[in-house]
Design a protein with these regions (language model features):
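Short loop/turn segments that flank or connect secondary-structure elements
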Residues: 1-203
Length: 203
């Protein structure tokens, strides 16, 4: 674990390698699972306020689900999340001609129609945040549908925390990310020095 103020970052977040391979998985994380995207309380009002600008990007079935269930729902974990279409994909999901899932909210953001990119939990994935009384814990969420992302991460040599750099800065700020990155780099240098010392001792 790495601790930065009241944030605890699991070792897997900095050690495991990951890079989304959207061509391979087709955005399965937006489709699979029992719940929609976790939402922060502040995001509930945001979704309400941007809905009319996001709506033109959504599928008819997504619009129907949102207007029947609400822009957000209180799920069985007693937390807020995005609504689902027929208990499957997120209601804000769109699909391109290749069947790849995209985020309608992010499409509206990319077009310059809104300032909100997408729920921060989506932006941070595969990191999931658990909030406790005094700390927030950042964990790496392993999911078999992301096996291609793990392989691509190894190929590119990108650890989880670097892959979600923009999201971490969005959530916690530039200083938090730079501190985390410095700690990781320093740890790597120390480990490399230890290996070199061991090699010298063997010689």
């Amino acid at each position: 674990m790495i601790q930065i103020e009241d944030k605890l970052i699991s070792a897997e977040v900095v050690e495991e390698l990951f890079h989304c391979d959207i061509i391979a998985c087709k955005g399965a994380c937006c489709v699979e699972g029992d719940l929609g995207a976790p939402l922060e309380i502040a995001e509930l009002d945001i979704l309400d306020s941007i809905y009319e600008k996001v709506k033109p990007y959504l599928r008819p079935e997504g619009i129907a689900a949102i207007e029947a269930q609400g822009k957000s729902v209180l799920d069985f974990t007693h937390s807020y999340s995005t609504p689902l279409v027929n208990e499957k994909e997120c209601a804000y999901v769109t699909f391109d001609e290749k069947g790849i899932a995209n985020c309608g909210i992010e499409q509206a953001w990319s077009a310059g129609d809104i300032a909100f990119r997408k729920p921060v939990s989506c932006h941070l994935y595969p990191i999931r945040i658990r909030e406790y009384r005094d700390v927030e814990v950042l964990n790496y969420d392993r999911w078999d549908i992301c096996s291609a992302a793990c392989s691509l991460g190894v190929k590119k040599g990108i650890p989880v925390y670097e892959f979600v750099k923009d999201a971490l800065i969005r959530k916690y700020g530039e200083e938090f990310y730079e501190t985390l990155d410095s700690i990781v780099k320093e740890k790597m240098l120390m480990e490399q020095q230890d290996w070199e010392d061991e090699d010298n001792d063997e010689d």
